[in-house]
Amino acid sequence: MLTSVRPADVVLEIDLSAIQANFQTISALVGPQVRVAAVVKSDAYGLGLVKVAGALIDAGCDLLFVGNLHEALLLRSSHISAAVAVFCDEFARYGEHYRSNGLIPVVNNSVELDAICGAREPQAYFLNVETGLSRLGLAFDDVRRRYLGGIFKRRPPSVVLSHLACSERAGDAMNLLQWNRFRATSDLLKPTLLSLAASAGVWLGKRYHFDMVRVGSALYGLNSAGIRPNPLKPVVGVKAKTLDARNVARSEAVGYGATFRTGRASRLAIAGIGYKHGLPWACANKISVRFAGYSAPLVGRVSMEYITIDVTDVPEALCGPGTNVELLSDDFTVDDLAASAGVHPQEVLTRLGVGCARQYLDGSSASAGFPGNLTNAGPGHDPRAILG
């Protein structure tokens, strides 16, 4: 009978104090008159919803945005009492769960708006309006028609929000176009509070801040707007273990497809991390890792559970079986890894969060993904049971 399991060999280290510092940086940027809401959807971008939410509340955050009702109920079952808004889930179906748990639905279409306004009890809600992303939200004509019908006088939204499509590019004409559309729509709903900017949008200037900004990726150290020098603290590191090391001759092929051949007699180390853990397949032959400060290139393709590293110039005592391999650090961040692979940093972060064992710098740990975190829920409060 198996009674114990050795610790995970691939660890995602998460610095909660860095998340708090990034929250304070954004708060200082927008000023005290602008509310900073934290976006913790998708399990806090893979970093652990409950842990991250608690750290943000300790830093002064009083409003959290989650992706769905499942996440909202997980927060409530974990005794998170801050205001929680749900980006997208069925109020018409789950209205009682919203009301009994003090949750705020984001209304994205006319069906949801009718359900809100037709409810016997008043329900606070945020109204999402479509300004150019072509994803979710009421179009201007729908808002105007409902305005003329008096629905917003009877049940006004607490906040009107929209989402910028091109905020990572400060000079893109879409930003001003969406600002003008948002302003035209929101003018119908005065004096409702307004929110347009997310993480990259906060760097577009005060006119985009309105009453509230919704910050996600910036909290987790991602500099999607490319601000230099980067004012955000790195939040995560990734470490794996060396499994084996071997000497090979010059001109030997390495990995699937023989995409790399040794240019000299070389020593190669095999580390137990691959695309299963969230390391992008496309970073093959493009990045370097570290052994106790020594840099060594990844050579050959990224496999499902392994990578190969040229450690010829690393002292053997530092790169033998069982030694640590550092893939992400303050010097080589998620942004850098994503750029090397030609993918979005948010994709890299969320995949690492699912594929690696999380370890928080306060010494605690958590399993990746929701099933492990649901152990925080009290008896009878499993969100999966509530929602069926």
Swiss-Prot record:
Signal peptide segment: none
Binding site for substrate: R135, M304
The reaction(s) this protein catalyses: L-alanine = D-alanine
CDD domains per UniProt: PLPDE_III_AR
GO molecular function: alanine racemase activity; pyridoxal phosphate binding
Pathway, per record: Amino-acid biosynthesis; D-alanine biosynthesis; D-alanine from L-alanine: step 1/1
UniProt keyword rRNA-binding, yes or no: no
Gene Ontology process terms (BP): D-alanine biosynthetic process
Residue positions where N6-(pyridoxal phosphate)lysine is found in the record: K41
Active site: K41, Y256
Any one of the GO CC terms: cytosol
Needed cofactors: pyridoxal 5'-phosphate
E.C. number: 5.1.1.1
UniProt KW keywords: Isomerase, Plasmid, Pyridoxal phosphate
Matching PANTHER family: ALANINE RACEMASE, ALANINE RACEMASE, CATABOLIC-RELATED
HAMAP family named among the record's database cross-references: Ala_racemase (MF_01201)
Family: Belongs to the alanine racemase family.
Task performed by this protein: Catalyzes the interconversion of L-alanine and D-alanine. May also act on other amino acids.
UniProt protein name: Alanine racemase 3
Species the sequence originates in: Mesorhizobium japonicum (strain LMG 29417 / CECT 9101 / MAFF 303099)
Gene from which the chain derives: alr3
